UniProtKB/Swiss-Prot annotation:
InterPro entries recorded: FAD-bd, FAD/NAD-bd_sf, PheA/TfdB_FAD_monoxygenase
Keywords in alphabetical order: Aromatic hydrocarbons catabolism, FAD, Flavoprotein, Monooxygenase, NADP, Oxidoreductase
EC number annotated for this UniProt entry: 1.14.13.167
Designated name of the protein: Para-nitrophenol 4-monooxygenase
Species annotation: Pseudomonas sp. (strain WBC-3)
Function: Involved in the degradation of para-nitrophenol (4-NP). Catalyzes oxidation of 4-nitrophenol (4-NP) at position 4 with concomitant removal of the nitro group as nitrite and production of para-benzoquinone.
Listed SUPFAM superfamilies: FAD/NAD(P)-binding domain (SSF51905)
Length: 403
């Protein structure tokens, strides 16, 4: 059996690769195990808030990511007919952060940037096509059994960072529950070539409608946009596809016909609000979607996952390199779980509820709230600065109080 005096990271998505990068830069030996043959080509998450941009800068990645990303100086709230409710301007935070903007880039491109940086670290190895089958641990090591095209193998390491997604095998194998709810609605993520800017759309838009609610964001610099909307969960994938021209005629500004846009990708999926009972059990520590899952309204899922990766790597470095107590990992677990339960999940839930609100009186109140935030820059600043809570213990309390 192979023994690693370091950390095994299970999951080769952006959260796992970021964790490996920070650990590797600290001189720790890391093996990343990923079931897929390479970086997933799916764009999936696309939005990165100011606290996340700051973290990416601390990882040494921001410059490379900015070269590929769409810079988003503002975002808009709209009615289903495209009418503007309010626009939020990130520049209102220019005195609070060096990163007064949102970045838009598919997580596959972010992962590829991280991967290129990892190739410079000889102490980090990525093993693609390695699927975790079993996890066991004792006081000194955690042992992972994997299957790959070459057969079954076993690897033991001092620590395991589980970043293997919402269906985490590691989380299941160590017996942690994943409590919460699955939303009734089925989300449909489509990537489409259509020029929303011709219709006055911002690069990021949240559409408020009881039926035709949606998120519309620019994915890259080629003219590709993400349109994410809701469908009845009882519909088959084929039925979702058949309904697409009808839905797009209502969802897209200008009521286009199919010959006026090109769909590059369509993915129906279910969304959840779930959280692991704890983020640490023995020598296994969870981060990202393996630890918590949220609906994508507001772009808080991967934004939080990036900060998980940074905090987890820092905790492991403190324990492994600096002789800190393993309670440091408990502190990580408690803090990041608190961030999700007290900020990320309630905020994403409120965003989702607002977008599909059907009560006319509540819709009027919601509109008034966002219009105030969109016209009063002091209110806008307070509204946007709240995202600093993604940082957990790093929240700049004096800024929040001064807002």
């Amino acid at each position: 059996m192979e023994t690693l005096d370091g950390v095994v990271v299970v999951g080769g998505g952006p959260v796992g690769l970021l964790t490996a990068l920070k650990l590797g830069k600290a001189g720790i030996k890391v093996v990343v195990l990923e079931a897929e043959p390479g970086v997933s080509p799916s764009p999936r998450a696309v939005a990165y808030m100011p606290p996340t941009a700051a973290a990416l800068d601390r990882f040494g990645l921001l410059q490379d990511i900015r070269k590929r990303a769409v810079m988003c100086p503002d975002f808009a709230y709209r009615h289903g007919n495209g009418e503007l409710i309010a626009k939020m301007d990130w520049s209102v935070l220019s005195q609070d952060t060096q990163y007064p903007y949102m970045l838009l880039l598919g997580q596959n491109h972010v992962s590829n940037v991280i991967f290129q940086h990892l190739r410079e670290l000889p102490n980090v190895e990525i093993r693609w096509n390695h699927r975790v089958e079993e996890v066991d641990q004792d006081d000194a090591y955690v042992t992972i059994e994997t299957s790959s095209p070459g057969g079954t193998s076993r690897l033991r390491a001092r620590w395991l960072a589980a970043t293997d997604g919402a269906r985490s095998t590691v989380r299941q194998k160590i017996g942690l529950t994943f409590d919460g709810i699955t939303w009734d609605e089925r989300l449909v993520a489509t990537n489409v070539f259509y020029d929303f800017s011709l219709h006055g759309y911002s690069r990021a838009n949240f559409v408020h409608d009881p039926v035709d609610w949606a998120v519309v964001v620019q994915l890259d610099k080629t003219g590709l946009w993400r349109v994410c909307y809701g469908e009845d969960a009882s519909l088959s994938d084929a039925e979702v596809r058949r309904r697409l021209p009808e839905r797009f005629k209502r969802l897209l500004p200008g009521a286009p016909t199919p010959d006026q846009y090109r769909v590059d990708h369509l993915n129906p999926y279910r969304v959840h609000q779930r959280c692991a009972a704890e983020f640490r059990r023995g020598r296994v520590v969870l981060a990202g979607d393996a630890a918590h899952a949220t609906n994508p309204m507001g772009g808080l899922g991967l934004s939080g996952g990036v900060l998980d990766a940074e905090h987890l790597a820092e905790a492991l470095i403190a324990v492994i390199k600096n002789g800190a107590s393993t309670k440091t990992l408990d502190e990580y677990s408690i803090d990041r779980r608190k961030v999700f339960l007290e900020f990320t999940s309630p905020t994403a839930t409120a965003n989702f509820t607002w977008m599909k609100e059907s009560d006319p009186a509540q819709r009027i109140r919601d509109d008034a709230m966002f219009k105030e935030a969109g016209t009063d820059r002091a209110v806008m600043r307070q509204f946007l600065l709240d995202l600093e809570k993604l940082n957990g213990r790093r929240v700049i309390e004096k800024k929040l109080k001064a807002a």
